[in-house]
């Protein structure tokens, strides 16, 4: 199947995943530099009364002579409009950067900032909410595949190498960035029985949107590159609905024997629900096969 056909097929499937509030699931596959890549995703709405605020992307594209795998989790708060906007625009903005192939880290940083600026400009339409983001881009060259992960907030990327979990993203917690927040004139609350919050409101120190808090928040992503080699088993992307109740290594151990990526993603979300996670849960598993 041609790259454009794969892209449209997967894009349509993921868009369809938000037509209801029930569990949604899907999968796809491709070849990158001779390596078989299979992915699966699963989403479950949490216990809150608001509509589903987790969105994801799982698709393949071509950029010049390079085949790409594009995967992302967007965990919204105070509404679904910002994560929905990110799902539709963030990867397009990244790929439009002229230095994307030569310097993907710089391209991603620029695109994150440009996208956040657009969200803030469009606050009248998009509302006062915001979103985390974790993006993972597989870039194939003639003989290798490289993974570039970026994130703001607490949605997480974890890779399994020979069965050992390695976190590629950074959890942007308010306490960790207290100095920066206070330097900008904000504060971090630490009320008994609650998590630390920026200005007593938001439980992450970096996010897209959140116009009312933006003076004290950052949308600057942490970005890291990781080679996909013979020791790479799979990649997990998930919102904090999973990570609140499961460690990185526990997640890897739960699915290490799964051959089907979709079944693995579904299993992780079900385990999170069984462990009393009340938040929306979205999970993507990307498996790498020789």
From Swiss-Prot:
<comment type="similarity">
    <text>Belongs to the PP2C family.</text>
</comment>
<feature type="binding site">
    <location>
        <position position="279"/>
    </location>
    <ligand>
        <name>Mn(2+) 2</name>
    </ligand>
</feature>
<protein>
    <recommendedName>
        <fullName>Probable protein phosphatase 2C 62</fullName>
        <ecNumber>3.1.3.16</ecNumber>
    </recommendedName>
</protein>
<feature type="binding site">
    <location>
        <position position="75"/>
    </location>
    <ligand>
        <name>Mn(2+) 1</name>
    </ligand>
</feature>
<dbReference type="GO" id="GO:0007165">
    <property type="term" value="P:signal transduction"/>
</dbReference>
<dbReference type="InterPro" id="IPR015655">
    <property type="entry name" value="PP2C"/>
</dbReference>
<keyword id="KW-0904">Protein phosphatase</keyword>
<keyword id="KW-0464">Manganese</keyword>
<dbReference type="Pfam" id="PF00481">
    <property type="entry name" value="PP2C"/>
</dbReference>
<dbReference type="GO" id="GO:0046872">
    <property type="term" value="F:metal ion binding"/>
</dbReference>
<dbReference type="InterPro" id="IPR001932">
    <property type="entry name" value="PPM-type_phosphatase-like_dom"/>
</dbReference>
<feature type="domain" description="PPM-type phosphatase">
    <location>
        <begin position="38"/>
        <end position="288"/>
    </location>
</feature>
<dbReference type="GO" id="GO:0004722">
    <property type="term" value="F:protein serine/threonine phosphatase activity"/>
</dbReference>
<dbReference type="InterPro" id="IPR036457">
    <property type="entry name" value="PPM-type-like_dom_sf"/>
</dbReference>
<keyword id="KW-0378">Hydrolase</keyword>
<feature type="binding site">
    <location>
        <position position="76"/>
    </location>
    <ligand>
        <name>Mn(2+) 1</name>
    </ligand>
</feature>
<keyword id="KW-0479">Metal-binding</keyword>
<feature type="binding site">
    <location>
        <position position="75"/>
    </location>
    <ligand>
        <name>Mn(2+) 2</name>
    </ligand>
</feature>
<keyword id="KW-0460">Magnesium</keyword>
<feature type="binding site">
    <location>
        <position position="240"/>
    </location>
    <ligand>
        <name>Mn(2+) 2</name>
    </ligand>
</feature>
């Amino acid at each position: 199947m041609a790259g454009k056909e794969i892209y449209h097929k997967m894009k349509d499937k993921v868009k369809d995943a938000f037509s209801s509030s029930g569990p949604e699931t899907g999968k796809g596959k491709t070849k990158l530099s001779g390596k078989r890549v299979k992915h699966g995703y699963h989403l479950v709405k949490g216990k809150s009364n608001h509509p589903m605020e987790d969105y994801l992307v799982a698709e393949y594209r071509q950029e010049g002579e390079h085949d790409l795998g594009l995967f992302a989790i967007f965990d919204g708060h105070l509404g679904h409009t910002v994560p929905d906007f990110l799902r539709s625009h963030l990867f397009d903005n990244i790929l439009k950067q002229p230095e994307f192939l030569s310097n993907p880290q710089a391209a991603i940083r620029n695109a994150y900032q440009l996208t956040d600026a657009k969200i803030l400009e469009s606050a009248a339409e998009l509302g006062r909410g915001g979103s985390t983001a974790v993006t993972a881009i597989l870039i194939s060259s003639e003989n290798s595949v490289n993974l570039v992960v970026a994130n703001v907030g607490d949605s997480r990327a974890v890779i399994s190498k020979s069965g050992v979990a390695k976190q590629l993203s950074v959890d942007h917690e308010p306490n960790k960035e207290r100095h920066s927040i206070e330097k900008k004139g904000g504060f971090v609350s630490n009320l008994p029985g609650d998590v630390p919050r920026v200005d007593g409101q938001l439980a992450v120190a970096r996010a897209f949107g959140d116009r009312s808090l933006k003076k004290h928040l950052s949308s600057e992503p942490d970005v890291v590159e990781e080679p996909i080699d013979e020791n790479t088993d799979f990649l997990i992307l998930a919102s904090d609905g999973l990570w609140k109740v499961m460690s990185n290594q526990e997640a890897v151990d739960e699915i290490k024997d799964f051959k089907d990526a979709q079944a693995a993603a579904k299993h992780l979300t079900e385990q999170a629900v069984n462990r009393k996670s009340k938040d929306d849960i979205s999970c993507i598993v990307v498996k790498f096969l020789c």
